[in-house]
Amino acid sequence: MKKLHVLFLSMALILVLAACSLDNGSTSKESDKGASKDSLTIGLSISTLNNPFFVTLNEGAQAKADALGAKLTVADAQDNASKQASDVEDLIQQGVDLLLINPVDSAAVASAVEAANAAGIPVITVDRSSEGGEVVSHIASDNVAGGELAGQYLTELVGKDAKVVELEGVAGSSAARDRGEGFNKAIAGQLNVVAKQTANFNRAEGLTVMENILQANPDVVGVFAHNDEMALGALEAIAASGKDIKVIGFDATDDAQAAVKAGTMAATVAQKPEEIGSKAIEAAVQYLKGETVDASIPVELELIK
């Protein structure tokens, strides 16, 4: 009887130890899961950090990453599509969990997106889209609608049949394409575009291009620039010429808003770069946690005048 009692005690002890082992295993899995959440690494390939808009977008992304406990690794493509392809490859080799890509060129970036797809790394495009590859989501303002806002207001300012200029962004970028599409849709049959040239979203180029346009077209009365940097460059050329020309930009950077307030710039279409960056990180973390993310996440626009 004594032997039987000992046997029962031994069996009970084995069961208790087994239960403890199971509990420890469950806790370990939960800890591992929590660790993976805390150690998410997100790569951001950004078109340029030499533009206030994208600096603010990057800051919004970093702030949200910090808040959510994610690590953000940023690569500045310096407005060079080839460098961006190399940057994306580097981020893939680093083993990031997800890639945020703000394309320099929407067509050229497709191969980089496809490379990430092949490596099993999900991609979210930010502000500008990719013309190829698979993306989880696209986060941006409605650039076509923004171009329409600019076109409608410029028509209101300068009147029907007035001669105007369109300063275009980087050729091949979806932002330049979409803003131009919206602008031209709004002014069709209303305004006469006498010059349409790229200034690559750059203030210095905006100045030079506008100087040349004014020499050939001294009777221009309005300008739509695909971003504020080009608009501000155009304003310098206009000021030097002594002409009164209405200029509308896009992005609502601090300098542009100051120019609108001062009365030198007619208006700027306000994007919210900080919110775009923040939403991008938010969507990335949600996706990596297995949550559903919308294929398109819009950010509202408004006209500041």
Where are these regions (language model features)?
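Hinge/cleft segment of the Venus flytrap/periplasmic-binding protein
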Residues: 167, 171-175, 186-187, 272-305
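Sec-dependent bacterial lipoprotein signal peptides
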Residues: 1-18
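Bacterial lipoprotein signal-peptidase II cleavage site
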Residues: 18-37
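Flexible loop/hinge segments that line or gate small-molecule binding clefts
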Residues: 98, 106-145, 156, 163, ...
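Extracytoplasmic "Venus flytrap"
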Residues: 41-64, 68, 72-90, 94-96, ...
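Hydrophobic alpha-helical segments within soluble ligand-binding/sensing domains
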Residues: 42, 84, 139-164, 205-207, ...
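Short, solvent-exposed amphipathic alpha-helices that sit
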Residues: 53-70, 146-150, 174-191, 205, ...
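Hydrophobic alpha-helical
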Residues: 98-117, 183, 200-258
